[in-house]
């Protein structure tokens, strides 16, 4: 656990040898629930624990889903992202039925929205039509300032708090804490 310069925010950074964890998890009888067991009691110290997962449904993501209470699903405003979303929602159902009955979907967040393109509008319309209130009201625009922030080791809201992307993520955070 590493403290940050931001009050009440600590991080557990990923490491290059995290790939070896996949092999280790496969060897363990409790491999699918290892992270859940490791995080038991974390709520006593932290109000929120966020697990940033790779965009695949491998063992690390399954472990995170088994440990989570809720899952926030980011979806890029692009055609193929819709296909991946269907697959992910099915995986969430599978994890819920086999490993974690308390798992729920906090919402679907539309990201990389380009207001100049018809595609972004079409994807947003389809998501809202099919998923309704599950889709966050706020969307995150495609933004150079968002893309720059990691290179400075900063969250977007610290890199440029007035940027459209930082403001969008602030709205998402407020909406997330309001949702059950």
Positions of predicted regions on the chain:
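Conserved catalytic-core segment of NTP-binding enzymes
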Residues: 40-144
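C-terminal boundary of histidine-terminating zinc-finger modules
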Residues: 150-171
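C-terminal alpha-helix
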Residues: 171-180
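P-loop/Walker-type NTP enzyme "switch/lid" segment
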Residues: 1-44, 99, 103, 125, ...
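Short, conserved glycine- and acidic-residue-centered signature motifs
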Residues: 28, 81-84, 165
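Active-site donor-binding loop signature of nucleotide-sugar glycosyltransferases
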Residues: 14, 138, 142, 161
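Charged catalytic carboxylate motif
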Residues: 34, 87, 168
